[in-house]
Regions:
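N-terminal leader/auxiliary helical segments
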Residues: 1-43, 47-196
Length: 196
């Protein structure tokens, strides 16, 4: 799961939202120095990643990506799973998607004091470009994935992974629809951030 799913599975506080994204920005961060609510959010982030990455259906779905892109299939799956969460939002939640996105953007801005500089830069871009609303469109996902490919520090053939997603869209969607309800139950059951 990528940023939007992590935010969705967080508590509705700035510290929790930041902690639930911080797992992707931990370079140089002393975890012990984080405020407890941020640290709990970070633990929740790790639970979500561990469950998703180890799920047999997710692992098996990596084979749907061409051999030259398979090494980065996990990244592509995280992003496309956010797309599916947005696309199927009303299947899982009663609150409107628009109000959740607006609130999450506001909470991320409130939580800037807890962020590393790279995280602050990324979240500013997320909010300013309204990335989550753009995730509804496959063409936008392709642009996001190609930008990620451009940031990888070594030669790779990850660019164009949207073509693998298009070719196996229905299969990937079914994987998401099977895995996400299980993930929600795991997060609630673990109660990493009390009150789940």
């Amino acid at each position: 799961m990528n940023y939007f799913a992590h935010l969705t599975l967080a508590q509705p506080t700035a510290a929790s939202k930041v902690g639930n994204l911080l797992g992707d920005f931990m370079r140089g961060v002393d975890e012990a120095s984080l405020p407890p609510p941020v640290r709990l959010g970070l633990r929740n982030h790790r639970l979500v990643d561990r469950f998703t990455d180890m799920h047999p259906r997710v692992r098996e779905s990596r084979r749907l990506f061409s051999p030259q892109r398979r090494r980065f299939a996990g990244v592509a799956l995280d992003v496309v799973f956010d797309h599916f969460l947005i696309r199927h939002w009303s299947r899982f939640y009663t609150e409107s998607l628009d109000s959740v996105i607006t609130r999450d953007y506001a909470l991320l801005r409130q939580g800037e004091i807890f962020m590393t500089e790279p995280m602050r830069h990324t979240t500013e871009r997320l909010v300013t470009l309204d990335i989550f609303r753009r995730y509804q469109e496959l063409d936008q996902l392709g642009e996001v994935l190609d930008r990620i490919a451009g940031r990888i520090r070594f030669a790779n053939r990850f660019e164009g992974s949207i073509e693998d997603i298009r070719a196996h869209y229905g299969e990937l969607e079914q994987v998401f629809l099977a895995v996400y309800p299980q993930l929600r139950r795991v997060v609630r059951g673990a109660s990493v951030e009390r009150g789940r």
